[in-house]
């Protein structure tokens, strides 16, 4: 019974792979890539724009994104501590509070440097 199950699995994986292989051929036939002059040119730094749009994005938005990611990761590190609050020893409390100190220190440092002040 075990060898039949393995054979059945291998057959289905093979059929699945063949279907997707055929679908790639069909997709390549119907959806051909468009060639343009800039597609095959060399570039030194960045990609040349296809249009003359000059959109300026405010740097404060990217700074806010970096802060959100930074503090989100720090709170993810603190998340397991709250579920094991009664199971940890004094050493874990010390490590947690040192980590919490650095989180709040970085928040105070950001506010002193006016990094958190948005100027839209």
UniProtKB/Swiss-Prot annotation:
Its EC number is 7.1.1.2. The keyword Metal-binding does not apply. Keywords: Electron transport, Membrane, Mitochondrion, NAD, Respiratory chain, Translocase, Transmembrane, Transmembrane helix, Transport, Ubiquinone. Its main location: mitochondrion. GO terms for molecular function: NADH dehydrogenase (ubiquinone) activity. It is a multi-pass membrane protein. The keyword Zinc-finger does not apply. The chain crosses the membrane at residues 6-26, 63-83, 85-105. One of its GO terms (cellular component) is mitochondrial membrane. It comes from the Eukaryota. Core subunit of the mitochondrial membrane respiratory chain NADH dehydrogenase (Complex I) that is believed to belong to the minimal assembly required for catalysis. Complex I functions in the transfer of electrons from NADH to the respiratory chain. The immediate electron acceptor for the enzyme is believed to be ubiquinone. Belongs to the complex I subunit 3 family. This is NADH-ubiquinone oxidoreductase chain 3. The gene is ND3.
